[in-house]
A protein has these predicted regions:
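Interdomain "pre-motor" coupling segment immediately N-terminal to P-loop NTPase/helicase cores
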Residues: 11, 16-67
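Walker A/P-loop nucleotide-binding motif
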Residues: 100-116
Length: 258
């Protein structure tokens, strides 16, 4: 078997990085002095790394992050904000995902909620978890349209399948009974096998009324499923008169999420 035949077969098996590495070794005279086992290990490492990198790129692309450049390392803990750095660094390990626990990120507009959520999502991608970002207004519209058209189960899978779901603008507006039913279906199916990050301008104690309060029989069911064992990250202002939008701090377009 010729070397070119080996290269062609590697390419046919979609092992292009391994094929390139093998070709480079054949052209490098110094490689002849290295034992076969070591050379083969080097080639396998190159293919392995290439596949891992490709998988990571796909996960990040499929997540559809609002802020794809967000990182935990770049999270700003200053600028007149009170934020739990120790908890954030702990959650960056993604242990909460293995525990199937949720995260609540609350704070005013421009406080950096979306950035932090996307940073958590990026850490999850780096550990090869599937992630999905979505604005709740878009989510509710998508689910209700799907229900009206008889394709609700298929639409729901987009949001139940990811290991980590980022729900931005959570309860920005009061939801309808139909919205509540769709949310309950989503939250129930994700419970005990995945994690969700909720980003909201409102404190958790206000969510009950935003969901309809006592007038909505589904309110208790929703809150019970998302609140238990959830991690809370309130982003608070130390002095409202000195507030600065985190969009400016992170160099983001003013039209981007909170």
């Amino acid at each position: 078997m010729t070397n070119q035949s080996t290269i062609d077969k590697l390419i046919e098996m979609h092992m292009t990085s391994m094929a390139d590495a093998f070709r480079n070794q054949m052209q490098d005279i110094s490689m002849k002095e290295i034992p076969f086992e070591d050379r083969f290990g080097m080639i396998v490492d190159i293919e392995y790394t290439s596949r891992k990198n490709s998988r990571l790129k796909r996960l990040i692309k499929n997540a559809e992050f609002e802020q794809p450049d967000a990182t935990i390392a770049a999270v700003d803990y200053g600028h007149n904000r009170k934020i739990n750095r120790h908890l954030i660094e702990r959650l960056a390990t993604c242990e909460y995902i293995t525990e199937y626990r949720n995260i609540f990120i609350t704070g005013a507009t421009g406080s950096g909620k979306t950035y932090l959520a996307c940073a958590f999502g990026m850490e999850a991608c780096k550990r090869y978890y599937s992630v999905k970002y979505v604005r709740v207004p878009d989510l509710l519209l998508d689910l209700q349209e799907a229900r009206d058209e008889g394709r609700f189960k298929d639409a729901l899978k987009k949001y139940t399948n990811p290991t980590l779901l980022l729900l931005d603008e959570w309860l920005l507006m009061r939801v309808t009974e139909k919205d509540s039913a769709n949310l309950l279906e989503l939250i129930h199916k994700r419970r005990k096998h995945s994690s969700t990050i909720f980003c909201s301008q409102y404190l958790e104690e206000d969510w009950y009324q935003k969901l309809g309060g006592k007038d909505n029989p589904l309110t208790d069911a929703i809150m019970d499923r998302i609140s238990f064992d959830s991690y809370k990250i309130p982003i608070m202002s130390l002095d409202p008169e000195k507030d600065i939008s985190m969009r400016e701090v992170y160099g983001l377009d003013p039209s981007q999420a909170q």
